[in-house]
Amino acid sequence: MDYFTLFGLPARYQIDTQALSLRFQDLQRQYHPDKFANGTQAQQLAAVQQSATINQAWQTLRHPLTRAEYLLSLHGFDLASEQHTVRDTAFLMEQLTLREELDDIEQSKDDARLESFIKRVQKMFDARLQQMVEQLDNAAWDAAADTVRKLRFLDKLRSSAEQLEEKLLDF
């Protein structure tokens, strides 16, 4: 059973996150291992496994990028384990330039420049995310997979910038 079915949701990117949360709570109550403490060893093991599956499904579907990756996996794109790289040279050059800029910001310890950088990267991420949503809505799986790969780069860059921000604030 796929994660969408487990939560009673249609297998599409845009989901009702409130329904996801409510169903998660229901499933957790229903399959919590403590409820099977007096059961047989097989029942206890099944409850632990079911609870782990529910938690994994919840973590996957509640985050936009992992939800997209999972949806693509249902259509034959295993982005989690693939060695496929982004072939868009202009995008890769842009990423190198942004990484260099982040390194320069770290060296200069320029808070204002870092704040501006984070906002710019967030705008880039949001634009790609919207592009990915449209591609998934239109079942453009190849294009969506490529956009997810690019979003991973931007997500890592954003995370690095936020870590630098925390580091600079600690001084």
Swiss-Prot record:
Q: Which superkingdom heads the taxonomic lineage of this protein's source?
A: Bacteria
Q: Which positions fall inside the J domain?
A: 2-74
Q: Does the keyword Chaperone apply?
A: yes
List, alphabetically, the InterPro entries matched: DnaJ_domain, HscB, HscB_C_sf, HscB_oligo_C, J_dom_sf
Gene3D superfamilies found in the cross-reference section: DnaJ domain, HscB, C-terminal domain
Q: Which SUPFAM superfamilies does the UniProt record give?
A: Chaperone J-domain (SSF46565), HSC20 (HSCB), C-terminal oligomerisation domain (SSF47144)
Which GO terms are recorded in the biological process aspect for this UniProt protein? [2Fe-2S] cluster assembly; protein complex oligomerization; protein folding
Instruction: Extract the GO molecular function terms from the UniProt entry.
Output: ATPase activator activity; protein-folding chaperone binding
Alphabetically sorted, this entry's keywords are: Chaperone
Q: Which Pfam families match?
A: HSCB_C (PF07743)
Q: Which GO terms describe its cellular component?
A: iron-sulfur cluster transfer complex
Q: Entry's PANTHER family?
A: IRON-SULFUR CLUSTER CO-CHAPERONE PROTEIN HSCB
Per its UniProt record, what NCBIfam families does this chain match? hscB, PRK05014.1
Family to which the UniProt record says this protein belongs:
Belongs to the HscB family.
Q: What does this protein do?
A: Co-chaperone involved in the maturation of iron-sulfur cluster-containing proteins. Seems to help targeting proteins to be folded toward HscA.
Fill in the subunit field for this protein.
Interacts with HscA and stimulates its ATPase activity. Interacts with IscU.
Q: What is this protein called?
A: Co-chaperone protein HscB
Q: Give the organism the record lists.
A: Salmonella typhimurium (strain LT2 / SGSC1412 / ATCC 700720)
Q: What are the leading ranks of the lineage?
A: Bacteria, Pseudomonadati, Pseudomonadota, Gammaproteobacteria, Enterobacterales
**Gene that produces this protein:** hscB
